[in-house]
């Protein structure tokens, strides 16, 4: 199907075509496609999400109604959270009997997932900026009793200044006080244990906003390690790992990170929802507080002299440490190249350029798992899986 052939006919979507000129495809979902578009009066660029509520004619009347209601619910939630600096802004909407057109700000930097693919792993500094913004978004959503239910790097966009914008509220839901959910939805490797338990136990009480915090932990781990905390080629075994909270800080990347960042990740990946960190608790964690600089500093000659002495002492130690560094021999490189950080990054970068995909570096570290998520969040029934 050509690019133009995939577009809805202009006779049925006169309002959209009157104001916007659709361009190339930016992404696809199960029943939707995202295109760049130009606003004709201003010549500004936007992104339009075109949702075919009929599934190309393959959906039943009941499925069409469900998708229509889900889209209207997504639009309603987007309007409720409009104005937040880190949430994608819905600019315009158009509706016909068969299509919805949702016009958003265009994020030219693309997905956080693509940025991570390019960078392999992120530093603590980059991760701190991204996670603080994400947690502030989640905090705002949860105060409105809105649960996102599909948090993952693919649904986090970046603007030109590398600020994040949370998107894809298709599975979002605004809860009534005390309400619990039982639907199994989301992307398998980001599912919280209680969501999986709901599919296996008819008597399970359900789940709430805590599922977003679990997904946040998976995202943070993935940004730092470059691979997800829970992965197995057999999906059922991966789900068992999630339900038992079976993950490790065993890959070489974790040797470069502080205990503080590991502690925060472990506060998210707690199997019991009631013991899991909330967004507010996470923002108060030392990981986000240790680099906060006071606006006013009182001058202290004694303190300044102490800093100078410590700086000189540190410089001397670094110099002698540098002098004692052992040369990298051929035997060391052959025996364990991943133990050397510069070589590790070089190998990762060239492996991707040569093979076009990431290579497995160990049983507990598989970047290929990152690419197993479908473009749109997955709906599935665990009851149909065989052990």
Swiss-Prot record:
Catalytic residues, chain numbering: 150
Reaction catalyzed: 2 ATP + phosphorylase b = 2 ADP + phosphorylase a; L-seryl-[tau protein] + ATP = O-phospho-L-seryl-[tau protein] + ADP + H(+); L-threonyl-[tau protein] + ATP = O-phospho-L-threonyl-[tau protein] + ADP + H(+); L-seryl-[protein] + ATP = O-phospho-L-seryl-[protein] + ADP + H(+)
Record: residues binding ATP: 26-34, 49
UniProt feature coiled coil, ranges: none
Domain comment (free text): The two calmodulin-binding domains appear to act in concert to bind a single molecule of calmodulin and are pseudosubstrate/autoinhibitory domains.
Protein purpose: Catalytic subunit of the phosphorylase b kinase (PHK), which mediates the neural and hormonal regulation of glycogen breakdown (glycogenolysis) by phosphorylating and thereby activating glycogen phosphorylase. In vitro, phosphorylates PYGM, TNNI3, MAPT/TAU, GAP43 and NRGN/RC3.
Protein name per the record: Phosphorylase b kinase gamma catalytic chain, skeletal muscle/heart isoform
Organism lineage string: Eukaryota, Metazoa, Chordata, Craniata, Vertebrata
Gene that this polypeptide is encoded by: PHKG1
């Amino acid at each position: 199907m050509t690019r133009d052939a995939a577009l809805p006919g202009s006779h049925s979507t006169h309002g959209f075509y009157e104001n916007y000129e659709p361009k190339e495809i930016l992404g696809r979902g199960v029943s939707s496609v995202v295109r760049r578009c130009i606003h004709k009066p201003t010549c500004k660029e936007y992104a339009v999400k075109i949702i075919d509520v009929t599934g190309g004619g393959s959906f039943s009347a009941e499925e069409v109604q469900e998708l229509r209601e889900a889209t209207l619910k997504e639009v309603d939630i987007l309007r409720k959270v409009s104005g937040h600096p880190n949430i994608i802004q819905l600019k315009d909407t158009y509706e016909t009997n068969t299509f919805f057109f949702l016009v958003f700000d265009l994020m030219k930097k693309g997905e956080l997932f693509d940025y991570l693919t390019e960078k392999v792993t992120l530093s603590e500094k980059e991760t701190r900026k991204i996670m603080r913004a994400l947690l502030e978004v989640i905090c705002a959503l949860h105060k409105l009793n809105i649960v996102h239910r599909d948090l993952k790097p693919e649904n986090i966009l970046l603007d030109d200044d590398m600020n994040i914008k949370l998107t894809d509220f298709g599975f979002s839901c605004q809860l009534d006080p005390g309400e619990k959910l039982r639907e199994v939805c989301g992307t398998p490797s980001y599912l919280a244990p209680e969501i999986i338990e709901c599919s296996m136990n008819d008597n399970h009480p359900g789940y709430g906003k805590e599922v977003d915090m679990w997904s946040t932990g998976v995202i943070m781990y993935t940004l730092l390690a470059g691979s997800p905390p829970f992965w197995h080629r057999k999906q059922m075994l991966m789900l068992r790992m999630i339900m038992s909270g079976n993950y490790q800080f065993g890959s070489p990347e974790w040797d470069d990170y502080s205990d503080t960042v590991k502690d925060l990740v472990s506060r998210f990946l707690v199997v019991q929802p009631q013991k899991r960190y909330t967004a507010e608790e996470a923002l108060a964690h030392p990981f986000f507080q240790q680099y906060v600089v006071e606006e006013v500093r009182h001058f202290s000659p004694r303190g300044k002299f102490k800093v100078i002495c410590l700086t000189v002492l540190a410089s001397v130690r670094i110099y002698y440490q540098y002098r004692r560094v052992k040369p990298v021999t051929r035997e060391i490189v052959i025996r364990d190249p991943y133990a050397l950080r510069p070589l590790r990054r070089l190998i990762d970068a060239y492996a991707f350029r040569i093979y076009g995909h990431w290579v497995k570096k160990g049983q507990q570290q598989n970047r290929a798992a990152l690419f197993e998520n479908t473009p749109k969040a997955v709906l599935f029934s665990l009851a149909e899986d065989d052990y």
